[in-house]
Structure formats: structure tokens, C-alpha cells
Amino acid sequence: MSQIKTIAVIGTGVIGTGWIIRFLAHNKIVHAYDKDIKLKKNLIAEIKRAWPYSKKLFNKKKLNLKNFKYFTSIEEALSGVDFIQECATENYVLKTKLMNTIGKYAKLNAIISSSSSGLLLSLIHI
């Protein structure tokens, strides 16, 4: 993961927030995407709330929010990223549409990862 510098997290719910915190703890540049700008304030508050626990877990001293950017445009969020962590709702239609959109805007050598736990990848039609 040391070669990965910039990461996009698609979806800023509970799972996405957890990934964002982990990636920030490892000094990655994080592009968070959610279509609702109103969620940004709550997301930053949650990152700050969880940081004392993350400091202990990852042995980090300081949270660097300069590495954090919030986007409401998926195209902008995916621009130039090395790794994409998809964290959308568990729904085949939604995931299929989202993965096709990610494929459209991601750079060719970007790694695409999904936090799906109850869906079969073979049923997500890309």
C-alpha cells in the first residue's frame, strides 16, 4: 500500500467513515465522495470524534485533515486516485450503476475495491 498515495472512498456512511479514518491514519490523501454536501459536516465531526481511538489503534499522534477532501462529484473524486474503496448501500442495481460510473472515470491502473459483504460480485453487472 506504500505505492498508493491517493484514495477515493465512495460513500460516507458508517463503513465509508471507517475506511476514511483508517486511510487518514496511514497518511493517505483521501477523496471522500457523497452526493449530499450536508453530510460533510457530520463526517468531519465523526472523524474527529473517533480520532483518539484511532491514534491508539494505529499509533499515530496527529490527524492531518489537510489530506482530506470532500466531493459531491464522483468524477472529481476519482480524478487521479490510485485506489477506490466503494462503500455504497447493499443493492445490486445501485452497485451495478455505481461500478459502471467508477469504471468510466477511474484511471486505468486504479485498484477498485468494494465493501460489499452480502452481495455476489458475479451478480453486479459491469
Q: Across the structure, where does each feature detected by a protein language model lie?
A:
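A short beta-strand-to-loop transition that corresponds to the Sensor-1 phosphate-sensing loop
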Residues: 115-119
